[in-house]
């Protein structure tokens, strides 16, 4: 891989051990993927997890004197000040959370603690070269916005932020952004949940291929729809780029989506029955519940408003906790507009700066939870909590009853 004289100096340690380690990471990544060079990036997003590996890497760079040339936004870990009022954590878990925040402050990150940066906190333009980690963020910025990012890890995204560059391979190159597989959709998509189930189907069908979707009916996905679609396609598969013909910016036509290549025969037709079968496969669990968890990816203000409408003044069962995880700006807006206070009177709590995959939720493990997000269920089940997946209205009804029928 070609390096400029300046890049060679960084690799040789002339600008400090921390920046050297970041460059070593980028160089190794570039060589692995046959990148011809490094290119400058305009933005970065780091999927910090508040877990040991990510925190160690950031601390290692900081100890070597590194700071970010391109300050990245960050994923959430958990709101230690707020959630410790409700749930017990160990000293080690709290110390790790505090270490994480301190390390990313020192390296110069923008501490947004938000898993959907392309929606509001770090929105790239069409064609911008960026380095975004977080599985739901990458398909959103590539597919819905037409920015250019590979499926970065938190490690490589932070290295790119420190150096201000990323290897030139993969989705940074025009010909690698074209579709690989054609899927037709003839189904009703009425809310975010439907788009999430569609995404889950697409991920299973496409794997790591780049799907091109043709809709038989006219659809207008919202930013939340795009976000949930990509999040689930990256959960059941490894989708980091997609096209929706006539909808997403790089697919004005079917021919453009495939980059002039021969258009393949449709690999599948997704119908209402396809979505229903997928939903049935994901949503079998019933019984008493102890938790409704929403916000994976983080909820927006409009989604919080919809929850208030669905409750219609009714209250959460005393046996059930109801948590909305949202971008901190949405939480602040809800408080300013008195929406948060109204929901709290019904037993609904919301928190910003927090992920579903954190130790603060461990008291719920072993009992049934409910969510509208297959991605949430995937991560929580890895921590020992079975989850049922339902559309939002059903989540609300289950919370009121304290059980899922």
Short names for language-model regions:
Residues 1-405:
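Non-transmembrane, aqueous-exposed alpha-helical and coiled segments at domain scale
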């Amino acid at each position: 891989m070609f390096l400029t004289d300046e890049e060679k100096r960084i690799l040789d340690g002339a600008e400090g051990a921390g920046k050297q380690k970041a460059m070593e990471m980028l160089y190794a990544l570039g060589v692995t993927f046959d990148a011809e060079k490094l290119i400058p990036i305009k933005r970065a997003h780091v999927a910090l997890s508040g877990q040991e590996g990510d925190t160690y890497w950031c601390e290692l760079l900081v100890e070597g004197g590194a700071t970010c040339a391109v300050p990245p936004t960050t994923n959430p870990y958990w709101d230690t000040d707020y959630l410790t009022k409700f749930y017990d954590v160990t000293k080690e878990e709290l110390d790790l959370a505090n270490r994480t925040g301190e390390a990313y402050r020192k390296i110069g990150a923008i501490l947004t603690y938000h898993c959907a940066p392309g929606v509001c906190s770090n929105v790239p333009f069409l064609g911008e070269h960026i380095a975004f980690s977080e599985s739901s963020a990458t398909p959103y910025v590539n597919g819905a916005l037409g920015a250019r990012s590979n499926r970065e890890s938190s490690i490589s995204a932070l290295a790119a932020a420190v150096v201000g560059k990323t290897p030139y391979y993969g989705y940074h190159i025009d010909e690698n952004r074209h579709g690989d597989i054609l899927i037709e959709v003839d189904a009703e998509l009425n809310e975010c949940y439907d788009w999430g189930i569609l995404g889950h189907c697409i991920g299973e069908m496409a794997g790591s291929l780049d799907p091109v979707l043709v809709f038989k009916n006219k659809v207008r996905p919202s930013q939340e729809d795009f976000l949930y679609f990509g999040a689930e396609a990256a959960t059941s598969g490894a989708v980091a780029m997609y096209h929706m013909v006539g909808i997403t910016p790089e697919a004005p036509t079917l021919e453009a989506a495939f980059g002039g290549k021969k258009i393949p025969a449709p690999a599948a037709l997704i119908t209402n029955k396809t979505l229903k079968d997928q939903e049935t496969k994901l949503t079998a669990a019933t019984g008493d519940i102890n938790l409704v968890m929403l916000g994976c990816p983080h909820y927006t203000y409009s989604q919080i408003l919809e929850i208030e409408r669905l409750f219609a003044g009714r209250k959460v069962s005393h046996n059930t906790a109801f948590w909305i995880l949202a971008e901190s700006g949405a939480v602040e807006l809800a408080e300013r507009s008195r929406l948060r206070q109204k929901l709290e009177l019904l037993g609904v709590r919301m928190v910003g700066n927090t992920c579903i995959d954190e130790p603060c939720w461990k008291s719920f493990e072993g009992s049934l939870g409910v969510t509208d997000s297959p991605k949430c269920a995937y991560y929580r089940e890895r921590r020992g909590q079975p989850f049922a997946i339902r559309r939002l209205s059903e989540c609300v009804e289950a919370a009121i009853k304290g059980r899922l029928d």
